[in-house]
């Protein structure tokens, strides 16, 4: 599990965070100061990269949280079997079986190159080249 620890106040919308053991992309981040002696709080909402579930937390801004180290890679589509795509990594020539994303179903064909990500042991095809 490759993660890095940062404080919530350093995060921005569009960055990634680990919530509930899943890598998630931050969709909104608001901070508020509750009063004279209270610490500022951050309300963070995120959507899971791999499962598309919405998650939210409310924590003090100086709380330390994990952010995933996301590895972006390029692969070539070798074959398509139903809802699975067989890819060959263009750097180390490993062969991978990944699920076909619904939004890219009509764009992915054999022989094209795709960008995919690896985070927390999961992999997902992001876009075609």
Swiss-Prot record:
Pfam families according to UniProt: eIF-5a, IF5A-like_N
CDD domains (UniProt xref): S1_aIF5A
Gene3D superfamilies: 2.30.30.30, Nucleic acid-binding proteins (2.40.50.140)
GO cellular component: a single term: cytoplasm
UniProt keyword terms in alphabetical order: Cytoplasm, Hypusine, Initiation factor, Protein biosynthesis
A biological-process GO annotation: positive regulation of translational elongation
Superkingdom per UniProt: Archaea
Keyword set includes Disulfide bond: no
Record localization: Cytoplasm
Listed GO MF terms: ribosome binding; RNA binding; translation elongation factor activity; translation initiation factor activity
Sites of Hypusine modification: 36
Family: Belongs to the eIF-5A family.
Function in brief: Functions by promoting the formation of the first peptide bond.
Protein name (database record): Translation initiation factor 5A
Gene encoding the protein: eIF5A
């Amino acid at each position: 599990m490759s993660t890095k620890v940062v404080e919530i106040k350093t995060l921005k919308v569009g960055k990634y965070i680990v919530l509930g053991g899943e890598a998630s992309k931050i969709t909104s981040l608001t901070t508020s100061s509750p009063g004279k002696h209270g610490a500022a709080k951050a309300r963070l909402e995120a959507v899971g990269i791999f499962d598309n579930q919405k998650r939210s937390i409310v924590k003090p801004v100086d709380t330390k949280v994990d952010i995933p180290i996301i590895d972006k890679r390029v692969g070539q589509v070798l074959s398509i079997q139903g809802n699975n795509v067989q890819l060959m990594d263009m750097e180390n020539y490993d062969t991978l079986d990944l699920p076909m994303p619904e939004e890219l179903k009509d764009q992915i064909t054999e022989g094209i190159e795709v960008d995919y990500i690896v985070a927390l042991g999961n992999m997902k095809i992001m876009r075609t080249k």
